[in-house]
Regions:
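Alpha-helical transmembrane segments in inner-membrane proteins
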Residues: 1-296
C-alpha cells in the first residue's frame, strides 16, 4: 500500500494528512482489494474447472472461458453501445465453456497434455472472431484495454464488481463434495445419486462468472487459474474442500507479489502485471507439460 509513484508514509496516515488519506482510500485500498479478489477468484475458477473437466491442465485461460467473455463484451459494445450488459458477457462465457467441456468429455484424448492445447486453439478461434467483430464495428479500442491486465487505474467505484467472487467462492466450497464426485467420473457421480449434468452446469457457471468478472475489471491474468491449483494440489493433496481456501489465499498472494514486481521493476514507471504473470506462468506451465508427458 505504500509502494507507488505518489509518496505516502505510515506517519502521514497516522497524522491525518488529508492528501495521504485521500490517496489511501481512493487508490491504494481499492487496488489492494482488487488484487486479492482477482487472485482468489481466478484461482478458484481454475480449481473448479480442473475438477469438472477431469484434467489438471484445464483453466479459464486454456479452455476459452476468458476469450468467450471478451466476445460477450464486444457484442455488448456493438449491439448496445457499451459493455455494461453483464448478462451477455456471462451468458456467452458460460455457453463457450460448456461447449468446450462437453467436447473434451466426448473425445477421450490419449494424453492429458492435449486438452490445454486444444483449449488454446479453441480460445484463439474465439479471439479471432472477437477481433474481427471489433475491427468491423470500430470497437477495437475497447477490446485492447482487456488484453493487458493492469491494476494502476483501479480506483474506488471501479472494482466493486469483483465482490461477486466472494459468494462464488462460498458456493464452490458448499458444492465441493459434488464437484469432487463429478471429477472422479460420470458413472461414479450417477451411482451416488447426483445429477451429473446439473453439477457440471453449476461448476461452469461458477467458473464463468468468476473469470468474466475479473477480466471485465482487470483484464487477462494468464495461467493464474492453471498454476495455483496445481501447486496447491501438489503440496497439499487433492481434497477439494480443503484446497479451496488454500487456493484462494495463494492465488491472492501470487497476484500481490507479481503486482509489487510490476511496480518496482522499472520504477517510477509501471509494467502491466499480465507480463509478469505470463513469464512466471509460462515457465511453470511448460514444466507441468514436460512433467505430464514423462508420466503419460
Amino acid at each position: 500500500m505504500f509502494v507507488g509513484v505518489a509518496d505516502m508514509t505510515p506517519q502521514q496516515l497516522f497524522s491525518g494528512d488529508a492528501k495521504a488519506l485521500e490517496l489511501f482510500f481512493t487508490s491504494r485500498i481499492p487496488r489492494l482489494f482488487a488484487i486479492l479478489l482477482a487472485g482468489a477468484g481466478l484461482s478458484i475458477a481454475g480449481l473448479v474447472m480442473q475438477q469438472i473437466s477431469q484434467n489438471r491442465f484445464a483453466a479459464p485461460s486454456t479452455t476459452g472461458t476468458i476469450e468467450c467473455a471478451m466476445l460477450g463484451y464486444v457484442m455488448s459494445v456493438v449491439f448496445f453501445g457499451d459493455g455494461d450488459h453483464l448478462w451477455l458477457v456471462f451468458g456467452i462465457s458460460v455457453l463457450g465453456t460448456l461447449t468446450f467441456v462437453h467436447f473434451i468429455q466426448r473425445i477421450q484424448f490419449k494424453s492429458v497434455v492435449f486438452v490445454p492445447l486444444v483449449g488454446i486453439i479453441f480460445g484463439n478461434v474465439i479471439e479471432s472472431m472477437t477481433t474481427f467483430i471489433a475491427y468491423k464495428y470500430d470497437a477495437l479500442q475497447s477490446l485492447s484495454a482487456w488484453s493487458v491486465a493492469n491494476f494502476a487505474n483501479i480506483l474506488r467505484g471501479d472494482f466493486e464488481l469483483l465482490y461477486i467472487a466472494v459468494p462464488m467462492v462460498i458456493l464452490s466450497y458448499l458444492f465441493a463434495a459434488r464437484i469432487s464426485a463429478v471429477g472422479i467420473g460420470k458413472d461414479f457421480a450417477v451411482n451416488l445419486g447426483l445429477n451429473y449434468q446439473q453439477v457440471v452446469t453449476i461448476g461452469v457457471l461458477l467458473v464463468s462468472i468468476m473469470s468474466a468478472s475479473v477480466v471485465m475489471i482487470v483484464g487477462q491474468l494468464p495461467f493464474l487459474g492453471l498454476i495455483v491449483p496445481n501447486l496447491v494440489s501438489h503440496f497439499y493433496g487433492d481434497n477439494l474442500k480443503k484446497n479451496i481456501p488454500l487456493t484462494a489465499m495463494y492465488g491472492a498472494i501470487l497476484v500481490l507479489g507479481c503486482d509489487l514486481v510490476s511496480r518496482l521493476i522499472i520504477f517510477p514507471h509501471e509494467m502491466p502485471i499480465s507480463i509478469v504473470i505470463s513469464i512466471l506462468g509460462g515457465v511453470v506451465f511448460i514444466a507441468m507439460l514436460l512433467r505430464g508427458k514423462q508420466h503419460a
